[in-house]
């Protein structure tokens, strides 16, 4: 039986994430579009990795493979000891809730729930924490992102940057080892974007693995490791910072 328990160790090769010869083909009227072509990628625990590339390059498809939102046409996707590409839909939901925190560009907070309720929601879904501990944990996470004083407000009362901070707190609700951030600073001013970036840096220092998709060239140059995707393939590494220079 495929394990969907919390991933606390890497796989047999010591990596938290490993993609092996991942191919993704989308069928269309013309026959088929190859969005990913033989991707081999390994990411270790506590790494902060940026995924960069032009629109349509395949970077979003790559993230969908890692999160299990989509499945490869061929190849393997492993996170810890779990073959993500082999999970059933029910197993996928459980695995994702326990092992993965996702931060989107547009926050996606539920508008009718308070900030505190938005953060406790993943805990309620996965039942990973005792009921009596959930509120305390949510408040601690909001304190970490400097949003505890807004705990009982609705999202509409917050600025975009504040909502993104809440979204980060929510992504940490079940203490996942892996955080996926898809253009998390895309709609933020530079000062707020810097603060959000600093939060991700602190998470890797605490042992989390963070993968960030970004078009922000200045931000990409600050990420310790970047992976460039072009035409569905990984571009060979170039000197530090050079990967970001071609991103418009």
Predicted regions and their residues:
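ABC-family P-loop ATPase nucleotide-binding domain
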Residues: 1-25, 236-248
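ABC family nucleotide-binding domain
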Residues: 14-230
